[in-house]
Amino acid sequence: MPPGSGRGGRRRAESLVREVLGLAGLRPSDRLGQHFLIDDRAVGEFLKPLEKAAAEGIREALEIGPGAGSITLPAAEVLDRIVAVELDNRLASALSRLAPARVAVITGDGVSHAAASQAPLVFSNTPFNLSPAIVEALAVNNRVAAAVLGVQYEVARRMTARPGSRDYSRLSVLVSLVFHAELAGVVRPQAYYPRPQVLTAVVTLRRRRRWRSLYARALELAGCAFTQRNKKASKVLRRCLEAAGCAPPPWLDSLGDARVWMLRPEDFVGLAEACRG
């Protein structure tokens, strides 16, 4: 029975976590932000979009931070090839002993692998402190067509926020420039061992636009502007442009009384183009 459809809620995932932690001889590390998924229904929140991707022909994936393999092993039942990158070499060694041949477990830094991966699909129950860095690495890597990410709920709100909303931020601009983002599910703290103190959200990303080098400057300007998100955009952007050594474009004053949080991602791209000359 697939993990997402088990009536007992936990069962397979919890048993797997116990087995892998036992093989590795370790306890969860606060320093590494380790929280292991032990609820089968929660695993199903990740599996559903992975199954959809597989049905569309996307069958090779990179997993960042497989941990004890709660998502890895059931995902291997629907995908042809998974490279799972784990920072903790003890976990990587233990998981590799249980993983099928189609799963290659390696030790390494997930952000670096996200930026360089050849796989069209990436999935991760992300360490919360690395979520924004992972998203940015995926955005820059045009080979990545889709991603399924578990992130802190507040981060998910920023990833899916639209201009004019309270959660709209530099991260929102980054995601919107290249991805279509959807909130696919919510996982409660009790689905993890040990329990985190926050909700986790599952976010799906689908690439809608290739990354351009111009976007780096657009995000630099957005990062500067959102430090004063409630101020008049024209004044804030003028200071940000001058700090970047760029002349403000003539249309800047046409923003009127608009605030920074009202600007569209395309506005920042337009500023970057003006800055380029």
Curated annotation (Swiss-Prot):
Tell me, in a sentence or two, what this protein's role is.
Specifically dimethylates two adjacent adenosines in the loop of a conserved hairpin near the 3'-end of 16S rRNA in the 30S particle. May play a critical role in biogenesis of 30S subunits.
Gene Ontology molecular function: any one = rRNA (adenine-N6,N6-)-dimethyltransferase activity
Where is the protein localized? Cytoplasm
Q: Which domain of life is it from?
A: Archaea
E.C. no:
2.1.1.-
Q: Lineage of the source organism?
A: Archaea, Thermoproteota, Thermoprotei, Desulfurococcales, Desulfurococcaceae
- Protein known as: Probable ribosomal RNA small subunit methyltransferase A
Recorded GO cellular component terms are:
cytoplasm
Q: Which residues bind S-adenosyl-L-methionine?
A: H35, L37, G65, E86, D109, N125
User: Which Gene3D superfamilies does the UniProt entry name for this protein?
Assistant: Vaccinia Virus protein VP39
Keyword Transmembrane belongs to the record? no
Q: Which gene encodes it?
A: rsmA
What is its EC class?
A: transferase
Name the family the entry cites: Belongs to the class I-like SAM-binding methyltransferase superfamily. rRNA adenine N(6)-methyltransferase family. RsmA subfamily.
Which key words tag this protein in UniProt? Cytoplasm, Methyltransferase, RNA-binding, rRNA processing, S-adenosyl-L-methionine, Transferase
**Pfam hit, one:** RrnaAD
Q: Which residues form a coiled coil?
A: none
Please verify whether the record's keywords include Transferase.
yes
